[in-house]
Swiss-Prot record:
It is a peripheral membrane protein. This is UDP-2,3-diacylglucosamine hydrolase. SUPFAM superfamilies: Metallo-dependent phosphatases. The gene is lpxH. The keyword Cell membrane applies. Hydrolyzes the pyrophosphate bond of UDP-2,3-diacylglucosamine to yield 2,3-diacylglucosamine 1-phosphate (lipid X) and UMP by catalyzing the attack of water at the alpha-P atom. Involved in the biosynthesis of lipid A, a phosphorylated glycolipid that anchors the lipopolysaccharide to the outer membrane of the cell. The lineage of its organism: Bacteria, Pseudomonadati, Pseudomonadota, Gammaproteobacteria, Alteromonadales. It catalyses: UDP-2-N,3-O-bis[(3R)-3-hydroxytetradecanoyl]-alpha-D-glucosamine + H2O = 2-N,3-O-bis[(3R)-3-hydroxytetradecanoyl]-alpha-D-glucosaminyl 1-phosphate + UMP + 2 H(+). It comes from Shewanella piezotolerans (strain WP3 / JCM 13877). The keyword Oxidoreductase does not apply. One of its GO terms (biological process) is lipid A biosynthetic process. Binds 2 Mn(2+) ions per subunit in a binuclear metal center. It holds the Pfam family Metallophos. Mn(2+) 1 binds at residues 8, 10, 41, 196. It is found in: Cell inner membrane.
Length: 238
């Protein structure tokens, strides 16, 4: 048996090729798999469970069907942090906390989306702290649907514009934040996404950090079993 991890699919109605690739993944890649973990940014944007787009409901049906075969877990990303219990139940996913620790084939492992590790990006971390406040979420979720969609569009545009001027190091995780979280959780291994820089990093302290790949140009999954750790590319259309 094996455990699969994916993240940063950024699904949207504008990219039916990614949606189809994920549907194919759910249909073909879950054999001999004990669990699937989705590490955030499943959707390009999520403005509330009450206004899910038709394609999102199609995906919910597919995930629900897959969840009858194995448990599917979800950690919020920076694009879909407003996914709630309503959509989770609709799709058969179990929502996990922002940082989740588990025993993975004898290795203590911590899972997270990864944006919290980019501590050099001070403006984003300030926004992240605000958006995670329970009262801020409550206010946002009670705004008219048109207002929420407008805010989401402006935030996406601002993010894309500001990211063009940020350095490589600011956009990546801060090594000290990685080591601090590993120490605080007493974990030997970390798995995250967000940076779109898939790799298996052996750290100086003997621990390991694994980054899952994004799905912009091809699919990507991390496959871990008792004896193997592998990042696997999934070309679209195959």
């Amino acid at each position: 048996m094996r455990t699969l991890f994916v993240g940063d699919l950024h699904l949207s109605a504008d990219r039916p090729d990614i949606t189809q690739a994920f549907l194919t993944f759910l249909e073909t890649q879950l054999t001999d798999t004990s669990a699937l973990y989705i590490l955030g940014d499943l959707f390009e944007v999520w403005v509330g469970d009450d206004i899910a787009e038709p394609f999102a409901n199609q995906l919910a049906d597919a995930i629900k069907l897959a969840s009858k075969k194995l448990p599917i877990y979800f950690i919020h990303g920076n694009r879909d942090f407003l996914i709630g219990e309503r959509f989770a139940q609709r799709s058969g996913m179990t929502l996990l906390p922002e940082v989740y620790k588990l025993d993975l084939y004898g290795t203590t492992t911590v899972l997270l989306h990864g944006d919290s590790l980019c501590t050099l990006d001070k403006p984003y971390q300030r926004f992240r702290k605000f958006r995670n406040l329970s009262w801020a979420k409550w206010i946002y979720n009670h705004l008219p649907k048109s207002k929420r969609l407008n805010i989401a569009a402006k935030l996406r545009s601002k993010s894309q514009s500001s990211n063009q001027h940020k350095s490589y190091s600011i956009m990546d995780v801060e090594p000290s934040a990685v080591l601090e979280l590993l120490d605080n959780t007493n974990a030997q291994q970390m798995i995250h996404g967000h940076t779109h820089r898939p790799a298996i990093h052996q750290l100086s302290n003997g621990k390991r950090r694994i980054v899952v790949g994004d799905w912009y140009e091809q699919g990507s999954m991390l496959c871990i079993s008792q004896d193997n750790v592998e990042l696997i590319e999934l070309p679209f259309g195959k």
